[in-house]
Amino acid sequence: MLSLDISGAYLNTSHKRLLCILQQKGFLEWVVQVTRGFIKGQTTHLVAGGLVSQEVDIKTGIPQGSPLSPILFLLFSSELLEILESRNTRGSAFVDDTNILTISPSVAVNCRRLEEAHNKCLAWARKHGVKFAPDKYQLIHFTRRRHKPGLDHPIHIQGFNGKPCDGLRVLGVWVDKGLTYRKHAQRAAEKAMLRLNCTLRIA
């Protein structure tokens, strides 16, 4: 599995493309207009050498802090998941965290498929004015086998060191290469003990 990171997900969302996507997906016109009102009206000032410009309208960006924002970005990036979908490869995403999962008996084959899928991601990013942050990528190989040869197989992506890790966090859940979830259970137990000790001190 290759875990990607979109740089400035909310800030780089094109208003024009988002509204077009809503129309293409068949949303009612009033939904499109409400969304237009939600994302429009953002302005900024440019500062250079102590000089401040007049207000400039911003044509990209979704307001942060609203429960509507992650939903709009998921709609904006939905085409990416459709592009990644194939017989042995699929994508999952929540806001700027996107994961590509591929399955085969060979780690080398998986790495090649992940590289191909990543190229599709880059093509989508160029089309939508989005940038990925390869220095924040993470790679992990999963297997249930006792003998785990080849789990150190790297992936070749510009800007990413390509080395697989032993575990990573997916939407708050720690997963390891053996899919034992021991680290997640350990972290949960540590948090529970910390809260219990704090409660006992109050009592």
Task: Identify the role of each PLM range.
Residues 1-63, 102-103:
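Conserved pre-catalytic core of RNA-dependent polymerases
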Residues 50, 119, 131-168:
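Short, conserved micro-motifs composed of acidic
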Residues 6-25, 61-62, 99-126, 144-146, ...:
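Catalytic palm subdomain of template-directed nucleic-acid polymerases
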Residues 159-203:
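Basic, alpha-helical interaction scaffolds
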Residues 70-105:
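Active-site palm subdomain of RNA-directed nucleic acid polymerases
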Residues 72-76, 113-117, 188, 192-195:
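Hydrophobic alpha-helical membrane-association signature
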Residues 5, 22, 35, 46, ...:
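Mobile genetic element proteins and their domesticated derivatives, centered on retroelements
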Residues 30-35, 130-136:
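Acidic/histidine metal-binding catalytic segments
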